[in-house]
A protein has these predicted regions:
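Active-site mouth of glycoside hydrolases
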Residues: 1-144
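Hydrophobic/aromatic ligand-binding patch that stacks against planar heteroaromatic rings
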Residues: 31, 148, 185
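Glycine-centered short loops/turns at secondary-structure junctions
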Residues: 34-36, 153, 190
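Hydrophobic beta-strand scaffold residues
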Residues: 39-40, 156, 193-194
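Active-site clefts of carbohydrate-active enzymes
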Residues: 47-52, 83-87, 112, 118-127, ...
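Hydrophobic alpha-helical scaffolding
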Residues: 57, 90, 169-173, 215
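Solvent-exposed polar/charged
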Residues: 69, 106, 149-150, 188
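Aromatic- and carboxylate-lined catalytic core of secreted/periplasmic carbohydrate-active enzymes
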Residues: 165-166, 179-260
Length: 260
């Protein structure tokens, strides 16, 4: 197992970074690049049994500068400031998250894409802030895509519109058809969506968290949908305005091109 910091007694020395961990991380990032896959690097998350989510602010700032210095040279890297940042607000209040964006932007000479992911659907970050390049939301209600586009004026990704799978959690047991339907709504409303699978596995290997082999039925359908989108205008499409029928029926277009 690799850990980002060196051990110090029973705990960690947050001022000393484990070189082997970051060499391994760089290897994996490079492998994704070789496959033509964008690497959205999650910098913080609340699901932590090592104490990393509760570092002091100055330790957080130093860590960010170090990670950006190591990974910014990879052209396919994006920065996700956090997975479900709002679950860490007790230890990292909003002004700290704002400063995190500033640090990443100031230390990345290549100005990679930057965003942040909410947990509670009512806790979207203020994506109008200048350090945010695109909007990331977690929300099952993909029909709000037009609302988010209008509110933030930036590209929108619903990167957790729930998962195809069969686990007990309600966010991880929608059907393949439902996930593809949500993708369709996101795309025709002028946005993007994230894909994942959460099928039970005898060795508890969920693709959602550990990768591996996709076993579901949504990914080939999404491949077909991608083909439809790529056959359309290179500039993309704009969602149709108005509440009826386009509040209930996803539709968009550009010029004489229509998707409904």
């Amino acid at each position: 197992a690799y850990y980002p910091f060196e051990k110090q007694g029973a705990g960690w020395d947050f001022s000393r970074y484990d070189i082997a961990f970051f060499q391994h991380l760089e290897k994996r990032v490079a492998q994704l690049g070789a496959l033509g896959i964008e690497a959205d690097i999650i910098l913080f998350h609340p699901y932590d049994r090592w104490g990393y989510a509760k570092m002091q602010h100055e330790e957080d700032y130093a860590y960010l500068r170090y990670v950006v210095a190591r990974l910014a040279a990879y052209r396919h890297v994006w920065w996700s400031l956090a997975n479900e940042y709002d679950f860490m607000l007790k230890d990292k209040p909003m002004e700290v998250w704002d400063h995190f964006f500033e640090i990443v932007q100031e230390n990345d000479p290549y100005d990679h894409l930057r965003s942040i992911h909410n947990g509670n659907v009512t806790m979207n970050y203020d994506h109008t802030k200048p350090g945010v390049t695109h909007v990331c939301v977690q929300n099952w209600d993909v029909k709000r895509m037009r609302e988010w586009r209008a509110a933030y004026g930036k590209p929108v990704i619903d990167d957790e519109c729930e998962y195809e799978g069969n686990i007990l959690r309600n966010w991880g047991n929608i059907t393949a058809r439902e996930l593809v339907h949500r993708y369709w709504i996101c795309i025709v409303y002028g946005g993007y969506a994230g894909h994942g699978e959460t099928y039970e596995h005898p060795e508890d290997i969920l693709w959602w968290s550990k990768g591996g082999v996709l076993v579901g039925e949504s990914w080939p359908r999404l491949k077909f949908l991608r083909g439809i989108v790529e056959e359309g205008p290179a500039e993309g499409i704009e969602p149709f305005a108005g509440s009826f029928p386009w509040g209930r029926t996803a539709g968009g277009g550009r010029g004489n091109y229509r998707l409904i």
